[in-house]
Protein backbone atom coordinates (compact mmCIF):
# COMPACT_ATOMS: atom_id res chain seq x y z
CA UNK A 1 0.00 0.00 0.00
CA UNK A 2 1.61 3.31 -1.06
CA UNK A 3 2.19 5.91 1.63
CA UNK A 4 0.38 8.65 -0.25
CA UNK A 5 -0.72 12.17 0.76
CA UNK A 6 -4.48 11.43 0.75
CA UNK A 7 -6.85 9.95 3.30
CA UNK A 8 -10.20 9.08 1.71
CA UNK A 9 -13.01 8.92 4.28
CA UNK A 10 -16.33 7.10 4.07
CA UNK A 11 -18.30 10.39 4.00
CA UNK A 12 -16.55 11.20 0.68
CA UNK A 13 -14.30 13.83 2.23
CA UNK A 14 -10.62 13.64 1.31
CA UNK A 15 -7.77 14.91 3.49
CA UNK A 16 -4.59 16.10 1.77
CA UNK A 17 -1.31 16.21 3.70
CA UNK A 18 0.24 19.43 2.38
CA UNK A 19 3.83 18.64 3.39
CA UNK A 20 3.87 15.28 1.59
CA UNK A 21 6.32 15.17 -1.37
CA UNK A 22 3.52 14.09 -3.73
CA UNK A 23 0.96 16.63 -2.44
CA UNK A 24 1.21 18.91 -5.49
CA UNK A 25 0.59 16.05 -7.94
CA UNK A 26 -2.31 14.75 -5.85
CA UNK A 27 -3.85 18.23 -5.63
CA UNK A 28 -3.62 18.60 -9.41
CA UNK A 29 -5.41 15.30 -10.10
CA UNK A 30 -7.93 15.70 -7.27
CA UNK A 31 -9.11 19.09 -8.59
CA UNK A 32 -10.66 17.31 -11.59
CA UNK A 33 -13.53 15.90 -9.54
CA UNK A 34 -13.37 17.24 -5.96
CA UNK A 35 -13.92 20.69 -4.46
CA UNK A 36 -11.61 22.27 -1.90
CA UNK A 37 -13.57 22.96 1.31
CA UNK A 38 -10.93 24.07 3.81
CA UNK A 39 -7.25 24.90 3.45
CA UNK A 40 -5.57 25.41 6.84
CA UNK A 41 -1.81 25.20 7.09
CA UNK A 42 -1.11 21.46 7.23
CA UNK A 43 -4.18 19.51 6.09
CA UNK A 44 -6.52 20.51 3.25
CA UNK A 45 -10.03 19.06 3.08
CA UNK A 46 -11.70 18.22 -0.23
CA UNK A 47 -15.25 17.00 -0.83
CA UNK A 48 -16.33 14.57 -3.55
CA UNK A 49 -19.88 15.51 -4.57
CA UNK A 50 -22.24 14.07 -7.14
CA UNK A 51 -22.10 17.30 -9.12
CA UNK A 52 -18.31 17.27 -9.10
CA UNK A 53 -18.29 13.71 -10.40
CA UNK A 54 -20.81 14.53 -13.14
CA UNK A 55 -18.80 17.57 -14.18
CA UNK A 56 -15.72 15.37 -14.42
CA UNK A 57 -17.62 12.80 -16.49
CA UNK A 58 -18.94 15.50 -18.83
CA UNK A 59 -15.34 16.70 -19.31
CA UNK A 60 -14.35 13.20 -20.45
CA UNK A 61 -13.07 11.57 -17.25
CA UNK A 62 -14.20 8.04 -16.39
CA UNK A 63 -14.98 6.39 -13.07
CA UNK A 64 -11.87 4.25 -13.55
CA UNK A 65 -9.67 7.36 -13.86
CA UNK A 66 -11.21 8.95 -10.76
CA UNK A 67 -10.84 5.81 -8.65
CA UNK A 68 -7.32 5.35 -10.04
CA UNK A 69 -6.37 8.81 -8.74
CA UNK A 70 -7.67 8.03 -5.25
CA UNK A 71 -5.95 4.64 -5.14
CA UNK A 72 -2.67 6.06 -6.46
CA UNK A 73 -2.36 8.77 -3.81
CA UNK A 74 -4.23 7.27 -0.85
CA UNK A 75 -2.35 6.51 2.33
CA UNK A 76 -4.84 3.76 3.20
CA UNK A 77 -7.30 1.61 1.26
CA UNK A 78 -10.17 3.58 -0.26
CA UNK A 79 -13.38 2.55 1.58
CA UNK A 80 -15.37 0.05 -0.48
CA UNK A 81 -18.55 2.10 -0.01
CA UNK A 82 -16.86 5.13 -1.59
CA UNK A 83 -15.58 3.08 -4.52
CA UNK A 84 -19.05 1.69 -5.24
CA UNK A 85 -20.72 5.07 -4.75
CA UNK A 86 -18.34 6.88 -7.13
CA UNK A 87 -18.73 4.24 -9.85
CA UNK A 88 -22.53 4.30 -9.60
CA UNK A 89 -22.72 8.11 -9.51
CA UNK A 90 -20.42 8.66 -12.49
CA UNK A 91 -22.27 6.07 -14.56
CA UNK A 92 -25.58 7.89 -14.03
CA UNK A 93 -24.45 10.71 -16.32
CA UNK A 94 -25.62 10.23 -19.89
CA UNK A 95 -28.04 7.38 -19.17
CA UNK A 96 -30.72 9.87 -20.19
CA UNK A 97 -30.36 12.08 -23.26
CA UNK A 98 -32.35 14.94 -24.73
CA UNK A 99 -32.39 14.81 -28.52
CA UNK A 100 -34.27 16.33 -31.44
CA UNK A 101 -35.97 14.24 -34.12
CA UNK A 102 -36.19 14.99 -37.85
CA UNK A 103 -39.33 17.10 -37.32
CA UNK A 104 -37.61 19.21 -34.66
CA UNK A 105 -39.47 17.69 -31.68
CA UNK A 106 -37.53 17.39 -28.42
CA UNK A 107 -37.23 13.77 -27.25
CA UNK A 108 -36.17 12.30 -23.89
CA UNK A 109 -34.45 8.95 -24.41
CA UNK A 110 -32.77 6.51 -22.07
CA UNK A 111 -30.38 3.58 -22.30
CA UNK A 112 -32.30 1.92 -19.47
CA UNK A 113 -36.09 1.59 -19.77
CA UNK A 114 -36.43 1.29 -15.99
CA UNK A 115 -34.69 4.64 -15.43
CA UNK A 116 -36.83 6.32 -18.08
CA UNK A 117 -39.96 4.91 -16.50
CA UNK A 118 -38.83 6.02 -13.03
CA UNK A 119 -38.25 9.66 -13.97
CA UNK A 120 -41.41 9.89 -16.09
CA UNK A 121 -43.48 9.08 -12.99
CA UNK A 122 -42.12 12.14 -11.19
CA UNK A 123 -44.91 14.71 -10.87
CA UNK A 124 -42.70 17.64 -11.91
CA UNK A 125 -41.11 15.77 -14.82
CA UNK A 126 -44.44 14.47 -16.12
CA UNK A 127 -45.76 18.03 -16.56
CA UNK A 128 -42.86 18.70 -18.96
CA UNK A 129 -43.52 15.65 -21.14
CA UNK A 130 -46.11 15.51 -23.91
CA UNK A 131 -46.57 11.80 -24.45
CA UNK A 132 -44.82 8.47 -24.78
CA UNK A 133 -43.66 7.15 -28.14
CA UNK A 134 -43.77 3.57 -29.40
CA UNK A 135 -40.02 3.15 -28.84
CA UNK A 136 -40.42 4.06 -25.15
CA UNK A 137 -39.03 7.59 -25.46
CA UNK A 138 -40.98 10.71 -24.46
CA UNK A 139 -41.77 13.90 -26.33
CA UNK A 140 -40.71 17.02 -24.42
CA UNK A 141 -42.58 20.33 -24.48
CA UNK A 142 -40.70 22.79 -26.68
CA UNK A 143 -40.39 25.32 -23.85
CA UNK A 144 -39.30 22.79 -21.20
CA UNK A 145 -35.75 21.88 -22.22
CA UNK A 146 -34.05 23.77 -19.40
CA UNK A 147 -36.60 22.92 -16.71
CA UNK A 148 -36.45 19.23 -17.63
CA UNK A 149 -32.68 19.16 -17.13
CA UNK A 150 -33.09 20.84 -13.75
CA UNK A 151 -35.70 18.34 -12.57
CA UNK A 152 -33.78 15.30 -13.84
CA UNK A 153 -30.67 16.50 -12.02
CA UNK A 154 -32.65 16.80 -8.78
CA UNK A 155 -33.75 13.17 -9.25
CA UNK A 156 -30.12 12.12 -9.61
CA UNK A 157 -30.22 11.44 -13.35
CA UNK A 158 -28.39 14.25 -15.19
CA UNK A 159 -29.37 14.24 -18.85
CA UNK A 160 -26.88 14.74 -21.65
CA UNK A 161 -28.26 17.44 -23.95
CA UNK A 162 -27.73 16.44 -27.58
CA UNK A 163 -30.65 18.42 -29.00
CA UNK A 164 -28.44 20.87 -30.85
CA UNK A 165 -28.57 24.64 -31.14
CA UNK A 166 -29.79 27.37 -33.44
CA UNK A 167 -26.85 28.60 -35.52
CA UNK A 168 -27.88 32.24 -35.06
CA UNK A 169 -27.29 35.03 -37.54
CA UNK A 170 -23.94 34.72 -39.32
CA UNK A 171 -21.35 37.37 -38.47
CA UNK A 172 -17.74 37.23 -39.60
CA UNK A 173 -15.40 37.29 -36.61
CA UNK A 174 -11.73 36.34 -36.84
CA UNK A 175 -8.89 36.43 -34.35
CA UNK A 176 -6.34 39.14 -35.16
CA UNK A 177 -3.35 36.95 -34.41
CA UNK A 178 -0.60 39.32 -35.53
CA UNK A 179 2.23 38.65 -33.10
CA UNK A 180 0.23 36.43 -30.76
CA UNK A 181 -1.86 33.26 -30.70
CA UNK A 182 -4.16 31.46 -28.30
CA UNK A 183 -2.22 29.49 -25.72
CA UNK A 184 -2.48 25.71 -25.94
CA UNK A 185 -4.90 25.46 -23.02
CA UNK A 186 -7.09 28.23 -24.45
CA UNK A 187 -7.28 26.36 -27.77
CA UNK A 188 -8.19 23.17 -25.89
CA UNK A 189 -10.87 25.03 -23.92
CA UNK A 190 -12.45 26.34 -27.15
CA UNK A 191 -12.24 22.90 -28.76
CA UNK A 192 -13.87 21.17 -25.78
CA UNK A 193 -16.62 23.78 -25.65
CA UNK A 194 -17.46 23.40 -29.34
CA UNK A 195 -17.45 19.62 -29.05
CA UNK A 196 -19.82 19.73 -26.08
CA UNK A 197 -22.08 22.41 -27.53
CA UNK A 198 -22.52 24.36 -24.29
CA UNK A 199 -20.83 24.41 -20.93
CA UNK A 200 -18.37 26.05 -18.57
CA UNK A 201 -14.64 26.71 -18.93
CA UNK A 202 -12.78 27.00 -15.61
CA UNK A 203 -9.50 28.92 -15.67
CA UNK A 204 -7.61 30.73 -12.90
CA UNK A 205 -7.62 34.52 -12.71
CA UNK A 206 -5.25 36.05 -15.23
CA UNK A 207 -5.20 32.97 -17.48
CA UNK A 208 -7.09 34.66 -20.31
CA UNK A 209 -10.74 33.66 -20.04
CA UNK A 210 -11.73 36.59 -22.26
CA UNK A 211 -9.57 35.19 -25.06
CA UNK A 212 -11.34 31.84 -24.72
CA UNK A 213 -14.56 33.76 -25.32
CA UNK A 214 -13.02 35.50 -28.32
CA UNK A 215 -11.85 32.14 -29.65
CA UNK A 216 -15.35 30.70 -29.32
CA UNK A 217 -16.78 33.74 -31.14
CA UNK A 218 -14.28 33.34 -33.98
CA UNK A 219 -15.11 29.64 -34.27
CA UNK A 220 -18.90 30.07 -34.29
CA UNK A 221 -18.99 33.31 -36.35
CA UNK A 222 -22.39 34.39 -35.16
CA UNK A 223 -24.16 37.26 -33.41
CA UNK A 224 -23.06 37.09 -29.79
CA UNK A 225 -24.54 38.32 -26.50
CA UNK A 226 -21.97 38.69 -23.71
CA UNK A 227 -23.23 39.04 -20.13
CA UNK A 228 -20.80 40.54 -17.60
CA UNK A 229 -20.80 41.60 -13.96
CA UNK A 230 -20.53 45.39 -14.36
CA UNK A 231 -19.78 48.24 -16.78
CA UNK A 232 -16.05 48.12 -16.01
CA UNK A 233 -15.98 44.50 -17.18
CA UNK A 234 -18.08 45.44 -20.21
CA UNK A 235 -15.51 48.01 -21.31
CA UNK A 236 -12.62 45.62 -20.65
CA UNK A 237 -14.31 43.03 -22.87
CA UNK A 238 -14.89 45.67 -25.57
CA UNK A 239 -11.26 46.80 -25.51
CA UNK A 240 -9.96 43.23 -25.63
CA UNK A 241 -12.24 42.25 -28.52
CA UNK A 242 -11.18 45.31 -30.53
CA UNK A 243 -7.54 44.43 -29.89
CA UNK A 244 -7.71 40.66 -30.43
CA UNK A 245 -10.36 40.22 -33.15
CA UNK A 246 -11.41 41.65 -36.50
CA UNK A 247 -14.39 43.39 -34.88
CA UNK A 248 -14.70 47.17 -35.30
CA UNK A 249 -16.22 49.68 -32.84
CA UNK A 250 -19.39 49.83 -34.97
CA UNK A 251 -19.96 46.09 -34.47
CA UNK A 252 -19.79 46.09 -30.65
CA UNK A 253 -22.58 47.54 -28.52
CA UNK A 254 -22.87 48.15 -24.78
CA UNK A 255 -26.21 47.56 -23.07
CA UNK A 256 -26.02 48.90 -19.52
CA UNK A 257 -27.61 51.45 -17.24
CA UNK A 258 -25.94 54.28 -19.13
CA UNK A 259 -26.02 52.99 -22.72
CA UNK A 260 -28.55 50.93 -24.69
CA UNK A 261 -26.82 49.79 -27.88
CA UNK A 262 -27.72 46.57 -29.68
CA UNK A 263 -25.10 45.45 -32.19
CA UNK A 264 -24.03 42.08 -33.68
CA UNK A 265 -21.84 41.71 -30.59
CA UNK A 266 -23.62 43.17 -27.57
CA UNK A 267 -22.12 43.31 -24.08
CA UNK A 268 -24.73 43.63 -21.32
CA UNK A 269 -24.50 43.69 -17.54
CA UNK A 270 -26.28 41.22 -15.29
CA UNK A 271 -27.76 44.17 -13.40
CA UNK A 272 -29.55 45.61 -16.44
CA UNK A 273 -30.90 42.19 -17.39
CA UNK A 274 -32.42 41.69 -13.93
CA UNK A 275 -33.76 45.26 -13.58
CA UNK A 276 -37.53 45.34 -13.05
CA UNK A 277 -40.18 47.90 -13.88
CA UNK A 278 -43.69 47.40 -12.54
CA UNK A 279 -42.73 43.97 -11.23
CA UNK A 280 -41.61 42.76 -14.67
CA UNK A 281 -38.12 42.38 -16.14
CA UNK A 282 -37.74 45.59 -18.12
CA UNK A 283 -35.12 44.46 -20.63
CA UNK A 284 -36.20 40.95 -21.59
CA UNK A 285 -36.48 42.11 -25.20
CA UNK A 286 -32.67 42.06 -25.32
CA UNK A 287 -32.72 38.25 -25.31
CA UNK A 288 -34.62 38.25 -28.61
CA UNK A 289 -33.34 41.53 -30.04
CA UNK A 290 -31.09 39.67 -32.50
CA UNK A 291 -30.74 36.06 -33.56
CA UNK A 292 -27.98 35.28 -31.07
CA UNK A 293 -26.00 32.17 -31.91
CA UNK A 294 -23.78 32.38 -28.82
CA UNK A 295 -24.37 33.67 -25.29
CA UNK A 296 -21.30 34.13 -23.08
CA UNK A 297 -21.66 34.35 -19.29
CA UNK A 298 -18.60 35.98 -17.74
CA UNK A 299 -17.84 35.07 -14.11
CA UNK A 300 -20.68 32.54 -14.17
CA UNK A 301 -20.27 31.86 -10.43
CA UNK A 302 -21.65 35.39 -9.87
CA UNK A 303 -24.65 34.91 -12.17
CA UNK A 304 -27.64 36.46 -10.31
CA UNK A 305 -30.38 33.98 -9.41
CA UNK A 306 -33.07 35.72 -11.57
CA UNK A 307 -30.91 35.18 -14.66
CA UNK A 308 -31.27 31.41 -14.23
CA UNK A 309 -34.96 31.71 -15.07
CA UNK A 310 -34.10 33.71 -18.18
CA UNK A 311 -31.37 31.23 -19.10
CA UNK A 312 -33.87 28.37 -18.97
CA UNK A 313 -35.48 30.02 -21.99
CA UNK A 314 -32.18 30.23 -23.92
CA UNK A 315 -31.54 26.50 -24.24
CA UNK A 316 -31.60 26.59 -28.05
CA UNK A 317 -28.59 28.95 -28.07
CA UNK A 318 -24.98 27.92 -27.50
CA UNK A 319 -23.98 28.99 -23.99
CA UNK A 320 -20.42 29.47 -22.72
CA UNK A 321 -19.77 30.09 -19.03
CA UNK A 322 -16.39 31.48 -17.94
CA UNK A 323 -15.22 31.34 -14.33
CA UNK A 324 -12.33 30.71 -11.97
CA UNK A 325 -14.50 28.56 -9.70
CA UNK A 326 -17.71 26.56 -9.92
CA UNK A 327 -18.50 27.22 -6.25
CA UNK A 328 -21.35 29.70 -5.67
CA UNK A 329 -22.22 31.44 -2.41
CA UNK A 330 -25.91 30.60 -2.89
CA UNK A 331 -25.24 26.90 -3.51
CA UNK A 332 -26.85 26.91 -6.97
CA UNK A 333 -24.04 25.08 -8.74
CA UNK A 334 -26.58 22.54 -9.99
CA UNK A 335 -28.41 25.28 -11.93
CA UNK A 336 -25.16 26.26 -13.66
CA UNK A 337 -24.71 22.58 -14.60
CA UNK A 338 -28.26 22.23 -15.92
CA UNK A 339 -28.83 25.58 -17.62
CA UNK A 340 -25.39 26.79 -18.74
CA UNK A 341 -23.89 23.34 -19.12
CA UNK A 342 -21.38 21.04 -17.44
CA UNK A 343 -17.70 21.77 -17.04
CA UNK A 344 -16.02 21.33 -20.43
CA UNK A 345 -12.48 22.34 -19.51
CA UNK A 346 -10.51 22.95 -16.33
CA UNK A 347 -6.83 23.96 -16.22
CA UNK A 348 -5.35 23.86 -12.68
CA UNK A 349 -3.66 27.13 -11.75
CA UNK A 350 -0.43 25.38 -10.66
CA UNK A 351 0.03 23.89 -14.10
CA UNK A 352 -0.44 27.25 -15.83
CA UNK A 353 1.81 28.92 -13.27
CA UNK A 354 4.62 26.41 -13.90
CA UNK A 355 4.42 27.17 -17.63
CA UNK A 356 4.90 30.86 -16.88
CA UNK A 357 1.49 32.02 -18.12
CA UNK A 358 0.45 33.49 -14.76
CA UNK A 359 2.57 34.95 -11.98
CA UNK A 360 3.57 32.55 -9.20
CA UNK A 361 1.55 32.96 -6.02
CA UNK A 362 2.79 32.51 -2.48
CA UNK A 363 -0.08 32.02 -0.03
CA UNK A 364 0.27 32.56 3.70
CA UNK A 365 -2.33 32.25 6.44
CA UNK A 366 -2.07 34.59 9.43
CA UNK A 367 -4.19 33.74 12.45
CA UNK A 368 -5.09 36.43 14.96
CA UNK A 369 -6.27 36.44 18.57
CA UNK A 370 -9.11 38.65 19.75
CA UNK A 371 -8.24 40.95 22.64
CA UNK A 372 -9.95 40.21 26.00
CA UNK A 373 -12.76 42.75 25.48
CA UNK A 374 -13.50 41.40 21.99
CA UNK A 375 -13.53 37.83 23.31
CA UNK A 376 -16.24 38.68 25.84
CA UNK A 377 -18.42 40.27 23.15
CA UNK A 378 -17.75 37.32 20.83
CA UNK A 379 -18.73 34.76 23.47
CA UNK A 380 -22.14 36.37 23.98
CA UNK A 381 -22.89 36.90 20.28
CA UNK A 382 -25.03 34.81 17.92
CA UNK A 383 -23.38 32.75 15.17
CA UNK A 384 -24.13 35.41 12.55
CA UNK A 385 -22.75 38.18 14.75
CA UNK A 386 -19.65 36.11 15.57
CA UNK A 387 -18.71 35.88 11.91
CA UNK A 388 -18.77 39.65 11.48
CA UNK A 389 -16.96 40.29 14.79
CA UNK A 390 -14.14 37.96 13.81
CA UNK A 391 -13.98 39.30 10.26
CA UNK A 392 -13.79 42.96 11.31
CA UNK A 393 -11.43 42.67 14.26
CA UNK A 394 -9.23 45.80 14.57
CA UNK A 395 -6.23 43.48 14.98
CA UNK A 396 -6.52 42.70 11.27
CA UNK A 397 -6.07 46.38 10.39
CA UNK A 398 -2.82 46.55 12.35
CA UNK A 399 -1.48 43.43 10.62
CA UNK A 400 -2.56 44.71 7.19
CA UNK A 401 -0.66 47.96 7.81
CA UNK A 402 2.49 45.98 8.70
CA UNK A 403 2.18 43.88 5.55
CA UNK A 404 1.72 46.95 3.35
CA UNK A 405 4.69 48.67 5.02
CA UNK A 406 6.80 45.59 4.26
CA UNK A 407 6.22 46.08 0.52
CA UNK A 408 7.15 49.72 -0.16
CA UNK A 409 6.72 50.87 -3.74
CA UNK A 410 4.75 47.76 -4.74
CA UNK A 411 1.16 47.66 -5.98
CA UNK A 412 -1.03 46.28 -3.19
CA UNK A 413 -4.62 45.04 -3.47
CA UNK A 414 -6.61 44.65 -0.25
CA UNK A 415 -9.78 42.57 -0.55
CA UNK A 416 -12.47 42.46 2.11
CA UNK A 417 -16.16 41.82 2.60
CA UNK A 418 -17.25 44.77 4.75
CA UNK A 419 -17.08 48.28 3.30
CA UNK A 420 -16.75 50.05 6.66
CA UNK A 421 -13.68 47.95 7.41
CA UNK A 422 -12.10 48.74 4.04
Give the location of each predicted region.
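Walker A/P-loop
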Residues: 196-217
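Post-DEXD/H (motif II) to motif III coupling segment of the RecA-like Helicase ATP-binding lobe
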Residues: 293-294, 299-364
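Conserved pre-motif I regulatory segment
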Residues: 167-202
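Hydrophobic anchor at the beta1->P-loop junction of P-loop NTPases
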Residues: 201-203, 226, 414
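Conserved helix/coil segment N-terminal to the catalytic DExD/H
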Residues: 256-294, 302-310
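Extended alpha-helical interface modules used as scaffolds for assembling large macromolecular complexes
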Residues: 1-168
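Conserved helix-turn-beta segment of the N-terminal RecA-like "Helicase ATP-binding" lobe
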Residues: 231-258
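Conserved interdomain hinge at the start of the Helicase C-terminal
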Residues: 377-421
Amino acid sequence: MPDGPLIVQSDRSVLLEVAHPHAADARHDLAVFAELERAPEHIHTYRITRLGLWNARAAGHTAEEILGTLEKYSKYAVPASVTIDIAETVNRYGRLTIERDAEGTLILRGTDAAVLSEVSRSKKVSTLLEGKREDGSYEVAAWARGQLKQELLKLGWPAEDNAGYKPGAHHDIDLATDGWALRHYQEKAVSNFLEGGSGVVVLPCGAGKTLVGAGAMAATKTDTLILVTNTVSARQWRDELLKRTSLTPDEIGEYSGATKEIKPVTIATYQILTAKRGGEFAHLALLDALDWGLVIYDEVHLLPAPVFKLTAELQARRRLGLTATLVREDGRESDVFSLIGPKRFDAPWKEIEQEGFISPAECKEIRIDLDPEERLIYAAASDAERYRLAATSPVKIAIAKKLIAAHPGERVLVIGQYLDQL
